[in-house]
Structures are given as C-alpha cells and as structure tokens.
C-alpha cells in the first residue's frame, strides 16, 4: 500500500519541530505538526526568563529563516544571546504564523500514543510497511491520524527526572509535589514570593540547576534570610562546572565560573554523594533521606 499521500507527523512545535516542518516543505513534502500547548514552543515559555548559552546564529534554522524572509522578518543579531522569551517572540512565534506552517499546526493537540495501523503485539507481519497511527487528544476529543512517518520533537522538559535514586519517584515525592519545582522557576520575578527568605535545595548537576543556583544566590543577596543548598549525586565538581574560559560555549563557561565563585564565597552550600530514597515532611520543611 502506498503511503505517499499521507502527511509526515511532527510531534512538538518547538524550534526543532518547526525547523523540521520547514525542511519538509522545502522538499515538497506535507508536514502535520501537533503541539500539546496553546502556543508554539509552549515548554520554552516555562523558562522564558533564562538566557541561553548559544547565540542566535546557533538557534535560527536556514530553511525556517527562508520561510520568514518574505514576511519582512528581521533576524536578530547573530552574536547576541537570547532568553527563552526572546526565542519565542523574535523567532518561533513569527515562524508559527507563516502561512505554510500555520495551516499545518495543530495547537492544544497532545499525541498520547503512536502505533502501526492494523498491527498489535500479536500481529506483526509486514508491520514496517503499515502507516503510523497517532492517537491525538485535542479540543474536540480524541482522534486517530495516519502518517507515513513520525518525527518526535516533543523534547524532555515536560518529563523531568525524578528525585528518587532508582529512576522512579522517591517515597513521598508525589505527596510533596506542590512544594517541588521540576523546572527553572523565575525566582527573581513571578516566583520571588515563594522562595524569598526560605531554605531552598537545588538537586541536580545540569545547567538548569546552575541557572537556578545563580538566580537564588542573587535573590539571597537581596533577601538575606534566603539559604541556598545544592545536592548532587556525584562526589566531585570537576566534570560538572564546564570548561571555564576554554568552554566552547562562552556563556556556559561563564556560568560555571560564577557558580564556582559562589561556592568559594560560601553563598551556596554544597552536598555531594546525595541519593534520595524518601522525602518526609517536618515542621522545618521537607527532609530528604
């Protein structure tokens, strides 16, 4: 059975998903883009206050820029470093409004499963020749969509790692979810009231943790009763803080140097070798065991 008449489904309307759509359009293929959020790049809006490590030149796809050019869009300075909000307002949202993209973009449409049409665990013959079937939950309920191919550009921001040691939630973690942020909260902006003059633990050694630590230290400078704690599973920072002045991404290197300085100055209390099995409430706050 020929599948040439079917669209190519793209899951996620972030920078990768819309760039993929631009490339498919340039090749005369028909993309169909599904975005779970209310806007393109919805997950980026959750860290819109964070400045990126990579300049604009790393973040604008050439085929996407070619679609934008006829609209009068002006590319941002190539060597400037955008925030997440900049990425949305100056690039991604304008791209989502370009007619060939807009006509194929389905917002508030979450892909909940992907399978092969007419096949299941027991029926596998010629499975590779069958079209994909996507179960999509949208404003009008669930529907099934057939596609000749699927590009998963959904990202991982909505599915962060659990605090538990075993790759599953720590005991008590789900019950404490209203007191745990699994993103980079805007502690200097809209979330300031939640973190000011509190004892705050950042768990993890990725660059999201670095950004949170940086902002919490700045908050503590203005709100002196704020305490900033940092816990990592490893026992050393040598491979965590980046390449400093020699880092291939200049802004990433700078952030690592700032975190090291804050540690040296005692503005961040570091705890190494931390493995969380259980989280319990107490009069002093959450306790990690």
Language-model regions, residue ranges each:
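Phosphate-coordination loops involved in phosphoryl transfer and adenosine-cofactor binding
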Residues: 5, 108, 197, 273
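N-terminal Rossmann-like FAD-binding beta1-loop-alpha1 element of flavoenzymes
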Residues: 6-32, 205-219
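Residues at the starts of beta-strands that form the adenosine-phosphate
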Residues: 7, 30, 199, 224-227
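Glycine-rich active-site loop/strand segments that organize a redox cofactor
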Residues: 37-91, 187-189, 228-250
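Feature captures the FAD/FMN-dependent oxidoreductase FAD-binding
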Residues: 74-159, 277-288
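Glycine-rich dinucleotide-binding loop and its adjacent helix/turn
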Residues: 152-220, 228
